[in-house]
Amino acid sequence: MVHFTAEEKAAITSIWDKVDLEKVGGETLGRLLIVYPWTQRFFDKFGNLSSAQAIMGNPRIKAHGKKVLTSLGLAVKNMDNLKETFAHLSELHCDKLHADPENFKLLGNMLVIVLSSYFGKEFTAEAQAAWQKLVVGVATALSHKYH
């Protein structure tokens, strides 16, 4: 179980409250597919993924990125109970989608990079540490069914 201090929770929620789910989610997922092209195999029904421009302009990528960040909002609201919060999604990604659990870590790291880009100086080292802790906790919770 991951324990978050009051300061870490505040750092996470202060950024989260300002996140544009569609923009940040779409960019995060799009960058994941560009930087780690082997992840594209999980999105073969999403249409044209032939170039960075095609990926970043793909409305299905943007929509799914928003969906991913909407789910991440559950983590922000349930930081002290990540394993139970993501039990269903862990089962879905393991049993039905057969997603590589390593990709959860890659996506989390990509989100931290995108948040840093969007929030600049407001995304302090302390905020980054708190967010990194959160995305690692979420990746671990999503990977639980695999063990």
Curated annotation (Swiss-Prot):
Top-rank taxon, per record: Eukaryota
Cited CDD domains: Hb-beta-like
Domain Globin: 3-147
A cellular component annotation (GO) from this entry: hemoglobin complex
Keywords: Heme, Iron, Metal-binding, Oxygen transport, Transport
Keyword Ligase: no
GO molecular function: heme binding; hemoglobin alpha binding; metal ion binding; oxygen binding; oxygen carrier activity
Signal peptide: none
Binding site for heme b: H64, H93
Short name of any one Pfam family annotated for the protein: Globin
InterPro entries (alphabetical): Globin, Globin-like_sf, Globin/Proto, Hemoglobin_b, Hemoglobin_oxygen_transport
Record flagged with keyword Transport: yes
PROSITE patterns on file: GLOBIN (PS01033)
Expressed in which tissues: Red blood cells.
Oligomeric and partner information: Heterotetramer of two alpha chains and two beta chains.
Family: Belongs to the globin family.
Free-text function comment from the UniProt entry: This is a minor early embryonic beta chain.
Designated name of the protein: Hemoglobin subunit beta-H0
